[in-house]
Regions:
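Rossmann-like adenosine-cofactor binding region
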Residues: 1-67
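C-terminal helix-to-coil terminal segments
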Residues: 58-116
């Protein structure tokens, strides 16, 4: 999945999606702003893009009047990341504290400079 950066905003636009082979399928579970929604809708309606499954959108929640709801070739899934499992969370936090205290590598650090 791509981070949302100035370089990736709108990356799934008409110009780039037209480079996909006829009948390609678009899946976006990363960031809504990666997709130019009007371009995707037109390419699906014209048949160049076979369909799409989308979990993220430029505006969330997706407004009831959005045309994606009425496009049978676009599947919309609920944007639900995951449930937090208490025991697993406590274990991960303890491991990170232990690594910090020992001067070891702390796993799972978010790199804000990369846009994550």
């Amino acid at each position: 999945m791509l981070p949302l950066t100035p370089e990736t905003t709108g990356i799934l636009n008409r110009k780039n999606m037209e480079k996909l082979p006829q009948g390609a399928y678009v899946i976006n579970v990363a960031r809504g702003a990666h997709v130019v929604e009007a371009d995707l809708l037109e390419l699906v309606q014209f048949g160049h893009i076979e369909g799409a499954t989308l979990d993220v959108f430029g505006h969330e929640p997706l407004p009831p009047a959005h045309p994606f709801w009425n496009e049978p070739e676009i599947t919309i899934t609920p944007h639900i990341a995951a449930l937090t499992v208490r025991d697993e969370s406590v274990k991960q936090i303890a491991e990170k504290i232990r690594a910090l205290e020992q001067g070891s590598l702390i796993r799972g650090i978010v790199d804000r400079l990369k846009g994550y």
